[in-house]
Amino acid sequence: MSASDLTSVQATAPQGRRQILVTSALPYANGQIHIGHLVEYIQTDIWVRTLRMHGHEVYYIGADDTHGTPVMLRAEKEGLTPKQLIDRVWTEHKRDFDSFGVSFDNFYSTDSDENRVLSESIYLALKENGLIAERAIEQAYDPVKEMFLPDRFIKGECPKCHAKDQYGDNCEVCGSTYLPTELLNPYSVVSGATPVRKTSTHYFFRLSDPRCESFLREWVSGLAQPEATNKMREWLGDAGEAKLADWDISRDAPYFGFEIPGAPGKYFYVWLDAPVGYYASFKNLCDREGIDFDAWIRAGSTAEQYHFIGKDILYFHTLFWPAMLEFSGHRTPTNVFAHGFLTVDGAKMSKSRGTFITAQSYIDTGLNPEWLRYYFAAKLNATMEDIDLNLDDFQARVNSDLVGKYVNIASRAAGFLIKRFDGRVQDSAMNHPLVAKLRDAIASIAAHYEGREYSRALRHTMELADEVNAYVDGAKPWELAKDPANAVALHETCSVSLEAFRLLSLALKPVMPRVAEAVEAFFGVAPLAWADAAKPLSSAQPIKAYQHLMTRVDPKQIDALLAANRDSLQADAAGAAAAGATAANAAKDAKNAKANAKAVAANGADDAPISIDDFAKVDLRIAKIVACQAVEGSDKLLQLTLDIGEEKTRNVFSGIKSAYQPEQLVGKLTVMVANLAPRKMKFGLSEGMVLAASAADEKAEPGLYILEPHSGAKPGMRVK
């Protein structure tokens, strides 16, 4: 655990037993849980279990995020009421979380009385504080369905490349972004009708108010992750810059959600009541269990509050949510922990490749959920780095670490102990130097978990497992067992091995709770806590007969998993239709296909797979940023001087000024396109392009992130 993380976790905590409220982001109630979702829930669950093993009072809260236009339209498409749809999805989500050992104390729904009351009270408090404003805005309106349309529910012809059937905010062919009013020949994806412009009164949370800005500037200093702090400071801008915009918190009927008090026909936008759903789920638990809800959530509470989220929703959880709480009289989050995205075999999850893997398909294929918990934990740390599920590595790591190293220790010793020594350990063996080394390591392993450095915790654990196996290999109990004269040595070897196995099981318990339960039953002990490192096995308590704890991953299981999730490209199109397209829109697809093909050819952009030969044409190189400066006269560009292992450095202009100060970049490694034709610009010659990532909807999720290779990469190395 880093010093900064330790400080952030404990700064506001009372001494001794802490009170801790923990949440994961709420899954949306219109789809299945997939392995990308599970990264977050497994990460949170491991942290929660770690804290519980310290004896703290911890509540892990979740709920389905149920409101909004997509849920309303999907329910209509399936011939259900929204309530029927979200009830069904809740059952599916709860089943999946239970399957993967996600130990919510309460998993609830944002469509609840508790959430309605809390959302209304927070809104009214903000209004009383002068932080709610009314404004007339003009929006696209479907005259057939008689509803206002979000940008993603409008399609038409791209105003830049003229590709057909593009969304109202960006073109998937040429990558342009634009306003819905700029679309050519627009139509509603709900009815196929041509939208009209219509004015409506909306309600805004005045995030631009100086009080909000002042509060957020102070609050951001407590965030544990430097990446999160940097993004917050980017969004806030410099003092006096007034970069924060007011937030539209209302939607017009018809809308599935909560009606705003005193505003008939106006509903809370889903992103207002969704985070309030954390509190609503906790309130439901408190009422049921007799917990003092107000003591946990009021301003000044000594209880701690942590949110685990994906980095794509950092904006909502570090700007809107803390400000809403602060100015409605509630305690603010102690910290927000963001994680990166999941790729599978180095690429975005794909239905056509079978790597868009649902939680249920994983279980149905017969794969052990604790294999995935272990693999994710072995990749996770306290940063926002993306992680990759490499299926070959998954199989190799599980088979090597969990079966070959860990489980193998118990299977090699238990039989001898039961057969020769009545299942009772040798008490003097509990003081063996190897046992002492493992016992002393437990505290640092627990600290790694609490600091969210799971990969370090598991790396340390497996290094210890290697030492235990080396000890067993050196002692050769199978040879000792051949001669009765070696009984004392055999007894010691088996006893040391099993106590070491107990300690390794303790170290792995937050990650593999079901295996830990089986180990506890095997030893006949109470549920293991961190303090039990100092409570060794005793001859007074014989072990039970050994039951096999884990099997190896069979390659055929991986093949079956991919096959179960593999889908045709036609089914992908059908899935897009289910997300909003109607029969009327589907009829346009064939007509638009040829036009889009021309637009693709003209713009050189296509989502279809490319050949390896096409990819090989792009020369991607590791580049070191040796100098960086702002470009005078440009509010978007930075001028980068890049070392890519050539005799001369490269000069590149990059539109990343909104995300980085020049001094932040100097010395960093990044990735550049080295064989891009030089481009003469107003400010000079640009000799390549650095790679950066951003959200598809940059208005809702602002931010740019340059690619940074792992340490060890050197300037000039090819990316391949």
From Swiss-Prot:
Residue positions binding ATP: K351
Q: Which UniProt keywords apply?
A: Aminoacyl-tRNA synthetase, ATP-binding, Cytoplasm, Ligase, Metal-binding, Nucleotide-binding, Protein biosynthesis, RNA-binding, tRNA-binding, Zinc
The record lists the catalysed reaction(s) as: tRNA(Met) + L-methionine + ATP = L-methionyl-tRNA(Met) + AMP + diphosphate
User: Where is this gene product found?
Assistant: Cytoplasm
Indicate whether Lipoprotein appears among the record's keywords: no
Motif 'HIGH' region: where in chain = 27-37
Classify the source by domain of life: Bacteria
Cofactor binding annotation: Binds 1 zinc ion per subunit.
**Entries under Pfam families matching the protein:** Anticodon_1 (PF08264), tRNA-synt_1g (PF09334), tRNA_bind (PF01588)
Q: What cofactors does this protein use?
A: Zn(2+)
InterPro entries named in the record: aa-tRNA-synth_I_CS, Anticodon_Met, M/V/L/I-tRNA-synth_anticd-bd, Met-tRNA-synth_bsu_C, Met-tRNA_ligase_1, Met-tRNA_synth, Methionyl/Leucyl_tRNA_Synth, MetRS_core
Please give the Gene Ontology molecular function terms for this protein.
ATP binding; metal ion binding; methionine-tRNA ligase activity; tRNA binding
Predominant location category = cytoplasm
Domain named tRNA-binding: residues: 614-720
Record keyword NADP present = no
Q: What does this protein do?
A: Is required not only for elongation of protein synthesis but also for the initiation of all mRNA translation through initiator tRNA(fMet) aminoacylation.
Q: Output this protein's name.
A: Methionine--tRNA ligase
Gene source species: Burkholderia ambifaria (strain ATCC BAA-244 / DSM 16087 / CCUG 44356 / LMG 19182 / AMMD) (Burkholderia cepacia (strain AMMD))
Q: What is the lineage of its organism?
A: Bacteria, Pseudomonadati, Pseudomonadota, Betaproteobacteria, Burkholderiales
